[in-house]
Amino acid sequence: MHFNLKLNLCLSDTNALKGIALLLLLLHHLFYIQSGLWNDIHLYNGHYLVNELGIFGKLCVAIFVFLSGYGLTIQANKSHKIQLGQFYKRRFSKLYLNYWFIWIIFVPIGLLFFQRTFDSIYINHVWEKLFIDIAGLSFACGFYGYNATWWFYSCIIILYLLFPFLYKLLGKYNFILIMLGLGIYVSSLFFLRAINQYLISFVLGMIAANGIN
Protein backbone atom coordinates (compact mmCIF):
# COMPACT_ATOMS: atom_id res chain seq x y z
CA MET A 1 0.00 0.00 0.00
CA HIS A 2 1.34 3.42 -0.96
CA PHE A 3 0.10 6.70 0.46
CA ASN A 4 1.25 10.27 0.50
CA LEU A 5 0.24 12.82 3.09
CA LYS A 6 0.87 16.22 1.62
CA LEU A 7 -0.54 19.66 2.31
CA ASN A 8 -1.45 21.39 -0.93
CA LEU A 9 -1.83 25.10 -0.32
CA CYS A 10 -2.81 27.34 -3.20
CA LEU A 11 -1.96 31.04 -3.33
CA SER A 12 -5.29 32.05 -1.81
CA ASP A 13 -4.71 29.58 1.05
CA THR A 14 -1.30 31.01 1.90
CA ASN A 15 -2.62 34.55 1.60
CA ALA A 16 -5.44 33.68 3.99
CA LEU A 17 -2.97 32.23 6.49
CA LYS A 18 -0.77 35.31 6.15
CA GLY A 19 -3.83 37.46 6.78
CA ILE A 20 -4.63 35.52 9.96
CA ALA A 21 -1.00 35.83 11.04
CA LEU A 22 -1.06 39.60 10.44
CA LEU A 23 -4.19 39.94 12.60
CA LEU A 24 -2.48 37.94 15.34
CA LEU A 25 0.60 40.14 14.96
CA LEU A 26 -1.57 43.21 15.46
CA LEU A 27 -3.19 41.58 18.50
CA HIS A 28 0.22 40.82 19.99
CA HIS A 29 1.68 44.28 19.53
CA LEU A 30 -1.44 46.07 20.73
CA PHE A 31 -2.15 44.02 23.84
CA TYR A 32 1.04 42.33 25.01
CA ILE A 33 1.84 44.68 27.87
CA GLN A 34 2.94 44.30 31.46
CA SER A 35 -0.01 43.60 33.71
CA GLY A 36 -1.06 46.43 35.95
CA LEU A 37 -0.66 49.20 33.41
CA TRP A 38 -4.41 49.55 33.20
CA ASN A 39 -7.60 48.07 34.67
CA ASP A 40 -7.32 44.67 33.07
CA ILE A 41 -9.60 41.71 33.82
CA HIS A 42 -7.95 39.30 36.22
CA LEU A 43 -8.38 35.67 35.18
CA TYR A 44 -6.34 33.55 37.62
CA ASN A 45 -3.02 33.52 39.48
CA GLY A 46 -1.82 36.87 38.17
CA HIS A 47 -2.92 36.23 34.59
CA TYR A 48 -4.88 39.03 32.94
CA LEU A 49 -7.22 38.83 29.96
CA VAL A 50 -5.73 41.51 27.74
CA ASN A 51 -2.16 40.38 28.37
CA GLU A 52 -3.08 36.75 27.65
CA LEU A 53 -4.65 37.81 24.35
CA GLY A 54 -1.41 39.59 23.52
CA ILE A 55 0.62 36.50 24.33
CA PHE A 56 -1.71 34.37 22.18
CA GLY A 57 -1.09 36.75 19.28
CA LYS A 58 2.56 35.70 19.11
CA LEU A 59 1.30 32.54 17.42
CA CYS A 60 1.70 34.67 14.29
CA VAL A 61 5.46 33.97 14.31
CA ALA A 62 4.92 30.20 14.13
CA ILE A 63 2.53 30.68 11.19
CA PHE A 64 4.97 32.90 9.29
CA VAL A 65 7.83 30.46 9.93
CA PHE A 66 5.69 27.47 8.89
CA LEU A 67 4.79 29.21 5.63
CA SER A 68 8.46 30.06 5.04
CA GLY A 69 9.47 26.42 5.39
CA TYR A 70 6.56 25.40 3.19
CA GLY A 71 7.28 27.93 0.44
CA LEU A 72 11.02 27.29 0.33
CA THR A 73 10.41 23.56 0.00
CA ILE A 74 7.86 23.97 -2.79
CA GLN A 75 10.37 26.07 -4.74
CA ALA A 76 13.23 23.66 -4.07
CA ASN A 77 11.12 20.70 -5.20
CA LYS A 78 10.43 22.40 -8.52
CA SER A 79 14.14 22.70 -9.31
CA HIS A 80 14.99 19.34 -7.66
CA LYS A 81 18.26 20.83 -6.45
CA ILE A 82 19.43 23.77 -4.37
CA GLN A 83 22.28 25.84 -5.76
CA LEU A 84 23.74 27.00 -2.47
CA GLY A 85 25.28 30.28 -3.66
CA GLN A 86 22.26 31.21 -5.76
CA PHE A 87 19.86 30.35 -2.94
CA TYR A 88 21.68 32.49 -0.39
CA LYS A 89 22.13 35.37 -2.83
CA ARG A 90 18.44 35.46 -3.73
CA ARG A 91 17.14 35.10 -0.19
CA PHE A 92 19.53 37.38 1.64
CA SER A 93 19.59 40.15 -0.95
CA LYS A 94 15.82 40.54 -0.66
CA LEU A 95 15.84 40.14 3.12
CA TYR A 96 18.60 42.67 3.77
CA LEU A 97 17.26 45.23 1.32
CA ASN A 98 14.00 45.24 3.26
CA TYR A 99 15.78 45.29 6.63
CA TRP A 100 18.14 48.11 5.76
CA PHE A 101 15.30 50.10 4.23
CA ILE A 102 13.56 49.91 7.62
CA TRP A 103 16.80 51.07 9.26
CA ILE A 104 17.12 54.05 6.94
CA ILE A 105 13.54 55.14 7.70
CA PHE A 106 13.12 54.47 11.40
CA VAL A 107 16.54 54.90 13.00
CA PRO A 108 16.81 58.61 12.05
CA ILE A 109 13.27 59.10 13.42
CA GLY A 110 14.34 57.47 16.68
CA LEU A 111 17.46 59.60 16.89
CA LEU A 112 15.82 62.91 16.01
CA PHE A 113 12.48 62.70 17.80
CA PHE A 114 12.80 60.11 20.59
CA GLN A 115 16.42 60.52 21.74
CA ARG A 116 17.09 56.84 21.04
CA THR A 117 20.83 57.20 20.66
CA PHE A 118 23.05 54.18 20.07
CA ASP A 119 24.67 54.70 23.47
CA SER A 120 21.30 54.62 25.23
CA ILE A 121 20.21 51.47 23.38
CA TYR A 122 23.36 49.35 23.40
CA ILE A 123 24.83 50.66 26.71
CA ASN A 124 28.26 49.07 26.13
CA HIS A 125 30.34 47.75 23.21
CA VAL A 126 28.27 50.15 21.14
CA TRP A 127 30.03 49.85 17.77
CA GLU A 128 30.27 46.05 17.95
CA LYS A 129 26.58 45.78 18.80
CA LEU A 130 25.66 48.28 16.11
CA PHE A 131 27.47 46.21 13.48
CA ILE A 132 25.78 43.01 14.70
CA ASP A 133 22.41 44.75 14.72
CA ILE A 134 22.86 46.03 11.17
CA ALA A 135 23.62 42.43 10.20
CA GLY A 136 20.27 41.43 11.73
CA LEU A 137 21.84 39.10 14.28
CA SER A 138 21.41 41.00 17.54
CA PHE A 139 18.89 38.59 19.07
CA ALA A 140 21.00 35.60 18.04
CA CYS A 141 23.94 37.22 19.83
CA GLY A 142 22.08 37.70 23.08
CA PHE A 143 20.68 41.22 23.00
CA TYR A 144 17.76 43.14 21.57
CA GLY A 145 18.68 45.56 18.82
CA TYR A 146 17.76 49.16 18.13
CA ASN A 147 14.15 48.06 17.87
CA ALA A 148 13.27 44.99 19.93
CA THR A 149 10.59 43.93 17.45
CA TRP A 150 13.27 43.35 14.82
CA TRP A 151 14.39 40.20 16.66
CA PHE A 152 12.59 38.14 14.00
CA TYR A 153 15.34 38.89 11.49
CA SER A 154 17.79 36.85 13.57
CA CYS A 155 15.34 33.96 13.46
CA ILE A 156 14.68 34.00 9.72
CA ILE A 157 18.35 34.59 8.81
CA ILE A 158 19.42 31.47 10.71
CA LEU A 159 16.55 29.43 9.27
CA TYR A 160 17.55 30.48 5.75
CA LEU A 161 21.14 29.47 6.50
CA LEU A 162 19.99 26.06 7.73
CA PHE A 163 17.40 25.34 5.04
CA PRO A 164 19.67 23.79 2.35
CA PHE A 165 21.06 21.36 4.92
CA LEU A 166 17.67 20.56 6.42
CA TYR A 167 16.33 19.98 2.91
CA LYS A 168 18.84 17.18 2.40
CA LEU A 169 17.24 15.32 5.30
CA LEU A 170 13.72 15.86 4.01
CA GLY A 171 11.71 12.79 3.05
CA LYS A 172 13.83 9.86 4.18
CA TYR A 173 14.80 11.46 7.48
CA ASN A 174 11.62 13.34 8.44
CA PHE A 175 11.73 11.78 11.90
CA ILE A 176 15.23 13.15 12.47
CA LEU A 177 14.08 16.61 11.38
CA ILE A 178 11.16 16.55 13.80
CA MET A 179 13.30 15.28 16.67
CA LEU A 180 15.90 17.96 15.89
CA GLY A 181 13.25 20.67 16.04
CA LEU A 182 11.75 19.30 19.25
CA GLY A 183 15.18 18.76 20.80
CA ILE A 184 16.24 22.36 20.19
CA TYR A 185 12.89 23.57 21.51
CA VAL A 186 13.15 21.56 24.74
CA SER A 187 16.84 22.27 25.30
CA SER A 188 16.39 26.07 25.10
CA LEU A 189 20.09 26.48 24.33
CA PHE A 190 21.05 30.12 24.69
CA PHE A 191 23.13 30.28 21.51
CA LEU A 192 20.11 28.98 19.56
CA ARG A 193 17.66 31.35 21.24
CA ALA A 194 16.70 32.94 17.92
CA ILE A 195 15.25 29.69 16.58
CA ASN A 196 14.69 27.34 19.52
CA GLN A 197 10.93 28.01 19.61
CA TYR A 198 10.41 28.10 15.85
CA LEU A 199 12.65 25.52 14.18
CA ILE A 200 9.94 22.90 14.71
CA SER A 201 7.37 25.09 12.89
CA PHE A 202 9.82 25.61 10.03
CA VAL A 203 10.51 21.87 9.78
CA LEU A 204 6.80 21.00 9.86
CA GLY A 205 6.23 23.46 7.03
CA MET A 206 8.93 21.71 5.00
CA ILE A 207 7.44 18.29 5.68
CA ALA A 208 3.92 19.51 4.86
CA ALA A 209 5.13 20.75 1.46
CA ASN A 210 7.11 17.63 0.65
CA GLY A 211 4.61 15.09 1.95
CA ILE A 212 5.03 11.94 4.01
CA ASN A 213 5.31 8.75 1.99
Language model features with spans:
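Catalytic-loop motifs flanking and including active-site residues across diverse enzymes
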Residues: 65, 200-201
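Juxtamembrane membrane-interface segments at transmembrane alpha-helix termini
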Residues: 82, 189-195, 209-213
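Alpha-helical transmembrane segments and their membrane-interface exit regions
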Residues: 201-211
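Short, aromatic-rich membrane-interface segments at the entry and exit
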Residues: 173-178, 192-200
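Membrane-cytosol interface segments of multi-pass membrane proteins
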Residues: 1-182
